[in-house]
Amino acid sequence: MGINFEDQTTLFNFVVREGNGVKGMIDSGLSSVPRPFVQPLSERIPTQKALTCEATQPIDLSNLDGPQHKEVAKQIVEAAETLGFFQVVNHGVSVELLELLKSSAHEFFAQAPEEKSMYLKEVSPSKLVKYGTSFVPDKEKAIEWKDYVSMLYTNDSEALQHWPQPCREVALEFLNSSMEMVKNVVNILMENVGVTLEEEKMNGLMGTKMVNMNYYPTCPSPELTVGVGRHSDMGMLTVLLQDGIGGLYVKLDNGEWAEIPPVHGALVINIGDTLQILSNGKYKSAEHRVRTTNIGSRVSVPIFTAPNPSQKVGPLPEVVKRDGVARYKEFLFQDYMNNFFGQPHDGKKSLDFARAE
């Protein structure tokens, strides 16, 4: 007997509470989008007139070590001050590893529902691993068309012990091989505002590291749904691997949306709220969203770097001295996290929590 997806409680329990996910719904033979996933008109993504973001030609990071260092640093700074997004190549992560990463993401989500649902927040054997669907489905007007698994990093041995078997080794290698690049980018951005971060401060501001694997199943009516709604990331920097299907959109200054085109072997970097706050607004956290598609299932793998929950965050004193005013207050990052995860995606509204009164 099939699932009655017309009954919204049955649907929600099947997808979210029992951990079958959007993928389980599609695998059951679903041919139309159920009402709880239909987005309001204002949130739908009109793909037929999508712009391509020309400002994201990949930056070659291998040139940081040579005479072109200043030019590359300038490109990074300009992207951080304007779009909040840029792509990089020669970033220190092998293309072979990136391909393995995409394969392992597909392998994880191809498992039987019970193999994934064991990591639902309420029953997960480890506080480091969480599997789920959408962002905060209990509170959303419309559920996002996405399943995911989050893997929090504490140390290598705990990752290899607790992260899901199909992806633990490759996800850990991705994280570890990306961190030098991340620190180089942060140092360039700090140097540009006249700040040198001591190692202890850097570790505090980037002490939370998480690898996510996102799965966007093929959708019968992409024009009705979103993979991820409008939001900015809460942390310092996000490093993202996207596959060849595409669907990542960034909001431009003029209010229009443009797609960040997939580039084979490249990684996407975007500025998070924390860097916007530290820089007193000089750097821009990027408002972005993800569309769905009917041409195949898409995967993406972001690394999120953010402060330790116990870290105090606010505009850096050197920057406030230069600007003459602090545009954001100082706060405990745990409080920012609670606010961020306590409400549905709504553009950059989460930043209101940090604004100076």
UniProtKB/Swiss-Prot annotation:
Gene: S8H
Binding site for 2-oxoglutarate: Y216, R298, S300
Family: Belongs to the iron/ascorbate-dependent oxidoreductase family.
Entry GO MF terms: 2-oxoglutarate-dependent dioxygenase activity; dioxygenase activity; metal ion binding; scopoletin 8-hydroxylase activity
SUPFAM superfamilies in the record: Clavaminate synthase-like
Domain Fe2OG dioxygenase per the UniProt entry, residue ranges: 206-307
Protein's name in the database: Scopoletin 8-hydroxylase
Expression induction: Strongly induced by iron deficiency, mainly in roots.
GO biological process: coumarin biosynthetic process; fraxetin biosynthesis; response to iron ion
Organism field: Arabidopsis thaliana
Enzyme Commission numbers on file: 1.14.11.60
Cofactor: binding comment: Binds 1 Fe(2+) ion per subunit.
Pathway(s) this gene product operates in, as recorded in its UniProt entry: Phenylpropanoid metabolism
Catalysed reactions, semicolon-separated: scopoletin + 2-oxoglutarate + O2 = fraxetin + succinate + CO2
Cofactor: L-ascorbate; Fe(2+)
